[in-house]
């Protein structure tokens, strides 16, 4: 739904990254770049920079749900993305809060491990994702390790990605996008696998060699949310969001001593032409 200069209203339910490369910081930058109005419900405050995570401070579950309801009962939220949730109680609080809102697109990014390798979720929260949140989702966007954990399938190639997507879809979500960036099979290409309406769609692109890759999953899921908030269907939203992510990666920047960050402010033609 159009709101003045904005193409829609979005909500990020995720953790805060003090380094600014991932989490709600990446989400809000993405929302701004793609001209949607961004709101948030913070699930945790992480102490991190480009070199790693040194602390995770969860927000109480009742406060997480209260944030969701504060925004959702006032704004007409067109799309929600979830990211780092951390615990079973947090997952249940998010599912409860979102269940009380009106119908909107839900993109569930099942964040489990930080780019640095630090764990961001408790074991029992994975079951809660499958039981409580994923059945509510329009789209789930796991990377390879997350897809393996959600599906119980070891992934070594694209056919395994397809099987994992099919298994995750059994939880009741609308669609599954298994991201192939973690699949290092010697190929110079990367394939993402989308399962939607019983069909399998492959997105294959050349691999971008860059160390400026912190926050790629957050950025992709928030870009999909932005495009769905503007009225695109899942296939269109994934297609346009992947274009945006690649542009962010190609123009990535080195801010600290560790992994570099994406260039979220990159200009995209389909957005700019709306305001010419």
Residues covered by each model-derived region:
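Short, small-residue alpha-helix embedded
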Residues: 30, 148-149, 210-234
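Conserved phosphate/ATP/ADP-binding segment of small-molecule kinases
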Residues: 123-200
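Phosphate-handling active-site elements
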Residues: 34-39, 200-201, 227-241
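Acidic-glycine-rich active-site phosphate/pyrophosphate-binding loop
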Residues: 1-6, 23, 188-203
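Short pre-catalytic strand/loop immediately N-terminal to key active-site residues, enriched for Gly-Thr
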Residues: 13-19, 200-214
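N-terminal phosphate-binding or glycine-rich loops at protein starts, especially the Walker A/P-loop
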Residues: 9-33, 238
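Charged C-terminal helix
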Residues: 7, 58, 235-276
